[in-house]
Amino acid sequence: MSDLREINRLNKDEEFEYFKLYSNSNGFRKWNLDEHNIFSKASLEYNFLKPDQMIEILKLVNQHNSNTSCKARTLEELNIHIKVYQNFLNKQQALRSPTTGSLNISGFGNPITSGGGGLGVLGGGGGGGGISSSSLGGLSGSGLFLNTMVNNTFQTILDSLDGNSSNNNNNNIPSTSSVKDVVSIGINPLFQKSVQSQSQLPTATNNNNKQPLELISKPIPTATATATTTATTTTTTIQPPIGGTKNTVNKEIEQDSNDNDNNNNTNNNNNNNNNNNNNNNNEEKEKQYLNYINNSLGELNKKDLKLLNEPWTVEDQKKLEDALTKYPPSRFSSVSRWQMVSKELGISPKAVALRYNQMLNQLIPKKPSLQQQQQQQQQQQQQPTTTTTTTTKPEQSIKSEEEEQTTGKRKSRSSFSSPSSSSKESPNKKEKTTHDTTTTTNTATTTTVTPNMTTPSIINSSPAIAANLLEADSLLQKNNQLLKQIRTSVMQLTDPQSTILTEVIENINNSIQLTGKWKDNIEMPPLPLKVNDLILSLISNNTSSSFKKPLSKKVTEWNLVVEDDAPTQDKK
């Protein structure tokens, strides 16, 4: 029967188990000594693996509680009590001696013995069945633990394999008819793993010193079986006969020499092939590396693409840039920075990081691939020199250039007419205004070089266009000075001169003509937009909000009306 020490120990362990499971011990209720004794007796009669028998044990415990006017136990409380009681028995089993029935480490505690219908801790001194710590000699704690583990788990197997072993070895093994074994077998399914690991150990029967049937009929695991079979198949080789005639030996020597020659030739060929393959592999690696550099972001997964495919406007991009400047990387870490920006924009931090990487990817120029570089080298070798020719373009080409300037679209070169067909046209069609003649003279001087899709356009690098851009810039600087004069006159409440406005408009038209030669961009060049900002700043203080709209990219749509308020000044 259990005593107060054992039940106090169990109650403390069970209270700690409640704290681990539920983070508090509010649902814990202590077990008294009579209640635990009834539970230990019921563990001998019923099996915990079967739910119906577990309910019977619970009924016996609750029947005692009803007789003593105590609160009934639940099935969950019984499960936790079983778990705690099993751990307690396992600890006591580890303290048992491998040579005697029990072991007392403390020297005065209570050894575990079997009897009295249940397993309990009996009161008594260190004498009798108990062994004091002084009798252990030089055994340390770790040595005692290993000794106990070996004897409890492998002693039966060693005895069954040893042919000279007798029943004397088995007499030293402690009795297995204790309640601990009964409880470990009849345990709740929640704790079935530890029971299976203990119950799967083979039991030795030493009748007539024969090996048990379990060891003989134990199957080989599949992994070890396949390993042994493969090893036997690889090691079995057919050997030639030991003895042989001289002719056969000579023939074998000749065959060996021929085989060696053939092998040398094949080895040389294989070496050459390997060198070629290595070169090809190096080229492929270079291609892969260049492709990886070109695709700096790499392949995105489906989730990232889904985030990037969400609607994203110019205002959102501006908000993102403002938020990035508001939360600089010098003051925020990457994680906290994305979190703060995501709060500003109302999107997830991952989406912010993807948009930021997308911005960086647009800023980084992509390098040409290896194939494009090879094509450029071949074209440069075929046509190493560049020639400058001044030719008069046909009428249709001039029209196509004018259409490109107005619409921003290109036409294929096949649409251009040949010189012979253009010469047959009437001379009336070839007559042009001064505006057309100026455009033809500007576009007549061209440089013919090898076509290259990856390099920038020729127009951007030609000296004529550079001169045009410089002239357009000078016109815009003049406009800035003229607009300053208009601003000062408006601030002084005086009417500005009409000649200044006409000069501003003429300068704008000339700058558009000069910068309209850009073929790569459909949009208007960025230089005249300075004028747009200046004019908007002038009219913003004197006009209504309905008129405060961005100016059109075409000057003809600006609708600037110039009134001749001072004709005398024009005459002067």
Swiss-Prot record:
Residues 196-283, 367-456 are annotated as: Disordered. Residues 426-435 have a biased composition (Basic and acidic residues). It comes from the Eukaryota. InterPro entries: Homeodomain-like_sf, SANT/Myb, ZZZ3. Residues 196-211 have a biased composition (Polar residues). Residues 311-360 form the Myb-like domain. Residues 222-237, 260-281, 371-392, 414-425, 436-455 have a biased composition (Low complexity). Signal peptide: none annotated. PANTHER family: MYB-LIKE PROTEIN Y, ZINC FINGER, ZZ DOMAIN CONTAINING 3. This is Myb-like protein Y. The lineage of its organism: Eukaryota, Amoebozoa, Evosea, Eumycetozoa, Dictyostelia. The gene is mybY.
